[in-house]
Amino acid sequence: MEGAPRRPDRHARSEEERHVSQYASRLGRRSPAAPTRRRMLRKPRRVAMLSVHTSPLHQPGTGDAGGMNVYIVELAQRLAAINIEVEIFTRATTAALRPTVELSPGVLVRHVDAGPYEGLAKEDLPAQLCAFTHGVMQAWAGHRPGYYDLVHSHYWLSGHVGWLAAQRWGTPLVHAMHTMAKVKNAALAEGDTPEPAARVIGEMQIVAAADRLIANTSEEADELVRHYEAERGKVAVVHPGVNLDRFRPADGRAAARARLGLPQDALIPLFAGRIQPLKAPDVLLRAVAVLLDERPELRSNLVVPVVGGPSGSGLAKPEGLQKLAARLGIADVVRFRPPVGQEQLADWFRAASVLVMPSYNESFGLVAIEAQAAGTPVLAASVGGLPVAVADGRTGFLVQGHDPAAYARVLRDFADDPALSARMGRAAARHAECFGWDTAASATADVYTAAMQAHRRRVRSHHG
């Protein structure tokens, strides 16, 4: 079937893989830091948070900016609210950036020079990790000893910088994978590029080195243990949150449609996110084509917004999707829109009949929770963390696989029952209330405490 993921045997393990595992485990062991005077705190006072490849100041939905950007910003601000200061280190992407930017009280963004400002693909960033680490160390050198109590790294590139920084500073390392190479490679979209072996090895090293690992869901925790041999006791599950002040039903669907210039009575299936094969926006377009083949009378009352910017390869460019829409004969109902700010994104969610997420993999799927918080149900692939984010049959529908016909059947149900979207939307808003960022920050602070305690025990054990 076109677009079906390739699924290699996950249980087969070659001799080469065993050697890689042993090698990574060996390298991943950190030498205990020299004994330092420890403050017996329940939680850290200041955290160095690392996000090498994407800045929390960038617009989500374009380039490599997405859910992780939102995650870092919201988490950092909520940690600051409970008296944990956060300094976020990220790569500078333009010479015009100030070295430091105060994002909000207690949250500072530090821009690190590492490689050319523009035109550097994410795939080329491993060669710049030495330069990035140098910049982090320079910032640290300007402070008194013990300035940072803990390092929290995001994504494997940051994990390698965090590994070295934590060892040099004598602090614990907490790491969040966000995505994993082995999991992505097991469910590739057609036209997508497999993650390289270097990333697999790098992730295994980080898993071995970290004092604690944060997983978005229990399934992700299981994947860390199964694919990367993580110690079960080191893995903590912390669900991401949603900004319930921003993403809420507010003044409702009719008002949002009026603001966006959308017809009041239309069926509006929305795609919102980066345009890349992994997110599978082409599945939505093909599903719409199937729907209109079966129900041509719906054409005059159908609008399909695609809100997001390019990333990746293959169908990553909007022009590729535009050409696909033309080939499918649905260009007249599809509206391409560039990435928008969070406030306007909330309006797009409110205006939609249903958010469609046919992704091949999602570690959690923040936009699913954001849409539900705004009062809109979700139609999604049953992958990754989406079964946690979406209550199947109550706040949306989960589809096994990526057959456009299966998505078309659900869209037809929304077309035939106009009250279905509103009914599910009310349940979705209630469901999303369980995912506040305050809860996520409190749980993360508990992980920090556990990491600091484990680190102290390890140091004491090493030095008698």
UniProtKB/Swiss-Prot annotation:
Example of a GO MF term: D-inositol-3-phosphate glycosyltransferase activity
Residues given in the record as UDP-N-acetyl-alpha-D-glucosamine binding sites: Q59, P60, G67, R274, K279, V340, E362, E370
Compositionally biased tracts (Basic and acidic residues): 1-20
Binding site for Mg(2+): F349, R350, A352, T376
Catalytic activity: 1D-myo-inositol 3-phosphate + UDP-N-acetyl-alpha-D-glucosamine = 1D-myo-inositol 2-acetamido-2-deoxy-alpha-D-glucopyranoside 3-phosphate + UDP + H(+)
Sequence similarity: Belongs to the glycosyltransferase group 1 family. MshA subfamily.
Name this polypeptide is given: D-inositol 3-phosphate glycosyltransferase
Gene behind the chain: mshA
